[in-house]
Amino acid sequence: MNIINLGILAHIDAGKTSVTENLLFASGATEKCGCVDNGDTITDSMDIEKRRGITVRASTTSIIWNGVKCNIIDTPGHMDFIAEVERTFKMLDGAVLILSAKEGIQAQTKLLFNTLQKLQIPTIIFINKIDRAGVNLERLYLDIKANLSQDVLFMQNVVDGSVYPVCSQTYIKEEYKEFVCNHDDNILERYLADSEISPADYWNTIIALVAKAKVYPVLHGSAMFNIGINELLDAITSFILPPASVSNRLSSYLYKIEHDPKGHKRSFLKIIDGSLRLRDVVRINDSEKFIKIKNLKTINQGREINVDEVGANDIAIVEDMDDFRIGNYLGAEPCLIQGLSHQHPALKSSVRPDRPEERSKVISALNTLWIEDPSLSFSINSYSDELEISLYGLTQKEIIQTLLEERFSVKVHFDEIKTIYKERPVKKVNKIIQIEVPPNPYWATIGLTLEPLPLGTGLQIESDISYGYLNHSFQNAVFEGIRMSCQSGLHGWEVTDLKVTFTQAEYYSPVSTPADFRQLTPYVFRLALQQSGVDILEPMLYFELQIPQAASSKAITDLQKMMSEIEDISCNNEWCHIKGKVPLNTSKDYASEVSSYTKGLGIFMVKPCGYQITKGGYSDNIRMNEKDKLLFMFQKSMSSK
């Protein structure tokens, strides 16, 4: 049996989970169709998902249709969970991108489609909610061609809420023959030579074009009234093809981890090549660590079943493997989809338990959530000792807060969400602290040179000290101290885009230790940074704004107020497209503002594009309870020279 892995993607409230539930029901995988409003869906299994009607974690289920097993990955639709969506892209054979016929193309829709297009993932576009009042499909078709792709093939006509095929294996409209000829040289040559071309020839060519992500079929339906679902199933099993297996050697990718109510760890793997068998002893990540498969499940027709073997391109579930982490692979390293640029969160907030004695419980709970979602980054502020969580947005914060309370029984309070800034030295400086020169209490001399690098370069560390003079353990201690120092600069933000050179060293044998060098390094670094001064860097977003021509003046005024850098403006009689860069801090809520002042017609799409020197205000990230006395003494001694 052929097996395919299909992603279901959509903007929030496009009906993604409802479509998935209908696919399960129509294929016979479930006896009734789950409803988001009733909280009885298969894919949204978490209590918080059922209650709020949104998908938080990617979930996997399975159906069989036309002799093809289709593993369906239902992904979050909210931008705050984009990291969860990005992880699923690596394992997809194809995707269904769902649009709402009423709301049309949203910023998230375009972002998802651009990624699918970039990664060349075969994609079917499904227009849901065609039953809604006020739907204008002709305008939506124009929007699809203008904002997604010209290479779309509308497979059906919609008449009075019903769908009728206009392109199939036995029939194809004349204008679609021309479309296929324009996309395939072989068919074009046969057409120009007046050779006979059957509807099946055109159909098979369309299948090949979709498989190469050169053409995107468009279907219609309504999940609420089960319209167009069977046709969508037929399209999925026709257009999304299974990959060819290249080896019999086991290769698998761990894409999801969850914990059941009893705390058992459940790991989901896609078997890329070969097979995984019960009682196999397999290697993790080509390391020296081996594990034995003591239990093995797969998903069949919406249900998990115990099996002895899971074959290529199928999903395996293994329980109670403590060493597993998302991104691990078993066996040979798999060839996965490349080209994803992971988006790092640019917001943060401090979190504290309502009861201070439950702090360790919060840390343990956050660690469990991190195992399930590696994009969840939390740390302890070295100055304030507060727990800090990096965030993608407000919705993610609310979900984390609810999970901590309901799943781990600990109530927490989040402080104000802040933008994550960074720091960079302004100029090249050199600083030395000498051994046995007060107030230096360490048996070490360290000299460091700091110099700024171009934005986006990151941290570079070099050493001018010979390993013949100062061995690896001492120098590694200095490098560790530098990395630790870069975690918090003069304003408490990460220091980046700089080169730090270890320029001078002295030690006394046998009293000097690596610990002396490790502990002295942050003081040398801090004094050098104070001498240099820092530029504050703020996160920037690349934006594309599409609004009706009548709203262009307001849009440009808004962008100027947000201190954006407009790179391109193109307008016609109806629409205006504006591209450029804008600070995240000034544009956090602008997508909803655009939707409001354009009555839902405008689209504000953004993606991270690095950091640049801030033009406006910024906030510090330091909450020092007491001053570092030794640093104060170093500063005083330096100022007296």
UniProtKB/Swiss-Prot annotation:
Q: May I ask which residue range the UniProt record assigns to the signal sequence?
A: none
Q: Give an example GO molecular function.
A: GTPase activity
- Annotated protein name in UniProt: Tetracycline resistance protein TetQ
Give the UniProt keywords, A-Z: Antibiotic resistance, GTP-binding, Nucleotide-binding, Protein biosynthesis
GO aspect biological process, one term: translation
Metal-binding among the record's keywords? no
Family listed: Belongs to the TRAFAC class translation factor GTPase superfamily. Classic translation factor GTPase family. TetM/TetO subfamily.
Note the InterPro entries from the entry: EFG_II (IPR041095), EFG_III/V (IPR035647), EFG_V-like (IPR000640), G_TR_CS (IPR031157), P-loop_NTPase (IPR027417), Ribosomal_Su5_D2-typ_SF (IPR020568), Ribsml_uS5_D2-typ_fold_subgr (IPR014721), Small_GTP-bd (IPR005225)
Q: Which NCBIfam families match?
A: small_GTP, tet_protect, tet_protect_Q
Binding of GTP, residues: 10-17, 74-78, 128-131
The top of its lineage is: Bacteria, Pseudomonadati, Bacteroidota, Bacteroidia, Bacteroidales
Species whose genome carries this gene? Bacteroides thetaiotaomicron
Which SUPFAM superfamilies does this chain map to? EF-G C-terminal domain-like, P-loop containing nucleoside triphosphate hydrolases, Ribosomal protein S5 domain 2-like, Translation proteins
Q: Where is the tr-type G domain?
A: 1-244
Q: What does this protein do?
A: Abolishes the inhibitory effect of tetracyclin on protein synthesis by a non-covalent modification of the ribosomes.
